Amino acid sequence: MKTIVCFLTILILVSSCESKNKKVVIIPGPKGERPDIKVVEGPSTVEDDFCYDCVRRCMVKGVGFYFRSCKGFVCRCYYPFMGGYGP
């Protein structure tokens, strides 16, 4: 019964946070105890969205462009040299 209640609680938290762009972080507890559940909202979700858009832009640039990195809101794509390997 405890497992079902715990599962339904996690399911409700995840579904309610999906519409608000929040993340649910589940931290495993010690053996035999329930895990901690934390709802995180902040710049990490904004940066994740930016990096997702970055990957899409690299793919749209043209055939052969690949995603390289996304750090500090800087999107980097690269075009591989002859031989198929990038820098």
Curated annotation (Swiss-Prot):
The protein's location, in the record's own words, is: Secreted
Q: Which UniProt keywords apply?
A: Antimicrobial, Disulfide bond, Fungicide, Plant defense, Secreted, Signal
Query: Which GO terms of type biological process are on file?
Result: defense response to fungus; killing of cells of another organism
| Cystine bridges | 51-70, 54-75, 58-77
Gene Ontology cellular component?
extracellular region
Secretion signal span: 1-19
Q: Which family does it belong to?
A: Belongs to the DEFL family.
The entry's protein name is Defensin-like protein 218
